[in-house]
């Protein structure tokens, strides 16, 4: 059952990153001087003739991330309102109702008024003198500019809207289409994000704290495996070109997979629904204590947990972003990395670092050590590793074999520490005295929801930092090094400052259901790594395990 929910989350991650990878490029504005027949692919060419700039591009991600936050916060309330089974099915269904964005983003043979591509008329073809002999009447083309006149390929006159960077980016109709495209795409994000929170009530129903630790740690496999499945094939240029050219069919296939997953879950979950949180009717509300979402949010421990989860989420997501990669390029003084696939390779190394963390660091979560010192160690180690990545990028550069190799190695190591930190944070609600099992779905809804809010704020600030030199000078090719340095300093500072919050965390407890058995008072020292070989009752370190 836990595996089904996690598989649904894996499908979400795959679908989400596939849509990002098959984005394609802008349609570009055709003129009399255009010397090559354009090749259109991906959904971006349906709406834009030029890039709108870094900040507007990031603003789309901010909007979607904030919507994911809202969905995550509400997911716990939905369990109380509809019961676990129906709450999960609603969110899987929400992922499926995104399908209108396929229609909105497809040119539909040039008949979609919300896109820029139109069947070329003979009159327009004759004006594109350098490529007219290579064009056919009815061929899909983007907007054309002849002199001061701008028109669609079918001859319809249009006016282009300027973006924040001064570029003419599209028509009012295509911008409207893009807005609808993002709205329906957001349903994938809202529905998919909540599934990782819905894996937690299943874990909470387990009697063994050790099993809870193992499955909480394994939850991250969903994201990491999904990203690797997407990124690895795109290292082959032919795969990327094919997927981008056929993006509608690729995404349609993904939506059908999610729908199939919904049907499988509905069939299987019906057999075990009685074991999980049920809808709170007036009758059973009077027989049991109903968890209050507001009362949980008012607790000081909740906000401490949210702060730590927020910084942890920033740590996990930031190295996956274009902002981080651009920052590394800026401090290395290079316009581009040594190989075109540098960013996908670093993405894969970061998420594959989870393997290192899973076997080397995450076993700590199964011990009876107090978690505070461990959290101090992991956050501080991550700050040091991030600084090492920055130092290697600045001194050796991303445009050299040696520099990229060292950045890649330490990205993998930092990923191990980062993902193990995530699993350490997720185990905390199960060990805190004041949280009960029937509150788990609400708590993790808050954890994921507010974590995305904190990350969105961080992403907005760092994106503004990075683009500030260009905006201030009005020069789109201005050096972004000052902004990159500011973004890196903020990133490292958060990893260090959060140690102050950790000091005030409550103690962890060994629990049997909601019963607190014993407080975890054993203090961990950096020289104590016996938990790596402890295996229940088979050796002298078994007392370290729960």
Curated annotation (Swiss-Prot):
The keyword Membrane applies. InterPro entries: MFS_Mycoplasma, MFS_trans_sf. It comes from the Bacteria. It is found in: Cell membrane. Keywords: Cell membrane, Membrane, Transmembrane, Transmembrane helix, Transport. Pfam families: MFS_Mycoplasma. GO terms for cellular component: plasma membrane. The chain crosses the membrane at residues 2-22, 62-82, 88-108, 179-199, 220-240, 248-268, 305-325, 344-364, 377-397, 401-421, 442-462, 485-505. It is a multi-pass membrane protein. Its main location: membrane. Belongs to the major facilitator superfamily. This is Major facilitator superfamily transporter MPN_077. The lineage of its organism: Bacteria, Bacillati, Mycoplasmatota, Mycoplasmoidales, Mycoplasmoidaceae.
